[in-house]
Amino acid sequence: MFTSLNTHSIFSKMRGTASLRELLAQAVKYRMSHLALTEVNGIWGFIRFVQFAREFNIQSIAGVNLITDYDDVILLVENQQGYENMCRIISDVHDSRDVHVADLLKSRHDGLFVLAHEKHVLKKLVKLIPDTHLFVELRPGVEERTAKGLAKQFQLEIVATGDVYFLSPEDQPAHKVLRTIEHNTTLTAIDSAEVKSEAHYFRTEKEMATLFPNSLDAINNAQYLAERCKTDWQFLNTIFPNMDLKNTREASRKLRKLVYAGAEKRYGRLKMGNPIENRDLRIVNSEHRITNNNSSASSAVKKRINQELAIITEKGFAPYFLVVWDIVRQTNATIGRGSGAASIVSYCLFITQVDPLKYNLQFERFIHPERVDMPDIDIDFPWDERDDIIDYVFQKYGLHRTAMVSNQVFLQ
């Protein structure tokens, strides 16, 4: 049995031509039990890959095709520690590609399997990584005798891969066009070293055996290695910057205090008595203002605030609202939008500018008791303040708890 352990999708920018679903469908067609996604210097599509793989009943393997100015290797994740190490290594490569893979792996190789096909890379890695986790990669473009020579020299096993960039040989011209665009040149002038040949398509086990007829053990080793990789993926834990508050209860208390202080700015002084029948709700400057004799309107505001805070506290979302409040108050010109505008808590924190009571907006559209994922508040900042605000967030909460989310754009 064969498993593809070196597979690129459209998330390998200007390189891969196959979508995640197309790759998984092909794996099912070829009766593969596992599939590794190894994009070039990134894991942009991996969470979607895991989700889609479950639909196809395929075991998903995390990996990366690590390419620096000097080296080209495949990393595959054995366990959670390996996944974390791989993520940090990828970040290091994005800081600078002027680095050797051996230096990247020196203190972060635990929990990772490494496949390399170049002698100068293996020569360094064999000193760092045990032979149980380091392999010679036999891929298209590498001769069998060369791989066997390296395996003998360094006393390592060989693993065969397809180094996949497209589904079939017919897709290679599309790959070439992508590489040409990437290098801002022409189809006739593109350096051939920058373009994969037709050999780099998604092969069946039989086709791999035809390509490498004297390396059947290497083909079988791919399945053996796949079964050693991590496949039980659960992305449930959230690393959250909680403003140095000791616990969620303290965060909830601080949030309540801020919300009620903001409510008095939004609505006027809130009366603490029982509701009365006479409702006198006046609009002043497009906001609800509570008159001195209107405890009914005051009660409606308090009731809505308490209802929202109860759900927010129960779900453990108080730190989230405090962080958003902290970021928003760095400027006076923010506009909160989306379903977050249905929250009176957001309104009283001046995150949003729309009164949900006035427009009868339902909080459950934003957060409901059954929700398990974190809420999402979209905020627009002035373009000329955006960089300063981002710098503030990184400085306030630290590099280890702050990240920017990439936006993926694809060619049709």
Where is each model-derived feature located?
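Extended substrate/RNA-proximal surfaces in nucleic-acid metabolism proteins
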Residues: M1-H34, V40-E157, E170-I181, D217-N220, ...
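Short, hydrophobic/aliphatic alpha-helical segments
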Residues: A147-F154, K302, F317-A333, I389-Q395, ...
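Non-catalytic structural connector segments
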Residues: M1, L5, N214-R337, L411-Q412
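Flexible glycine/proline-rich, aromatic-decorated loop/lid segments
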Residues: Y165-E198, V354-P369, D391
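Conserved short loop/turn motifs at secondary-structure junctions
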Residues: L37-I43, E137-V142, F166, P241-L245, ...
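A structural-propensity feature for long, helix-poor, extended segments
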Residues: E205-M208, F366-R401
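Extended, hydrophobic alpha-helical segments in both membrane/secreted and soluble proteins
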Residues: Y320-C348, Y359, F363, I389
